[in-house]
Design a protein with these regions (language model features):
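Amphipathic alpha-helical interaction surfaces in cytosolic regulatory modules
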Residues: 12-38, 43-91
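N-terminal presequence-like segments and adjacent domain-start helices
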Residues: 1-12
Length: 93
């Protein structure tokens, strides 16, 4: 399954907005997906990604699903945020 992060916007900021995105994703996109299914999180088209938004979305996805791959992470904002999550929240992707 591929999750297109840009569907939630191209400027992704704030913990409340991230929580709302995760709840929508959980209700409509990932609800019936087995935890063993490979998940690809695609950041194509995302201009700004903050650690607070990503911590509400990416971290719980990585905790729930066993096989998560990140796509199109070349953007410097996306890279910096992912590095921050890896450092401070033990993100293992």
């Amino acid at each position: 399954m591929i999750i297109y992060v840009k569907k939630f916007g191209d400027v992704l900021v704030s913990r409340p907005a991230g929580r709302e995105a995760f709840l929508a994703m959980s209700a409509y996109i990932t609800r019936d997906v087995p935890t063993t299914e490979p998940i690809e999180i695609d950041f194509e088209g995302v201009k700004v990604l903050t650690p607070s938004w990503a911590d509400e979305v990416i971290t719980p996805l990585a905790e729930r699903f066993k096989n998560v791959t990140l796509l199109h992470t070349e953007n410097s904002s996306v890279q910096a945020t992912l590095n921050t999550l890896r450092k401070y929240s033990d993100l293992r992707i």
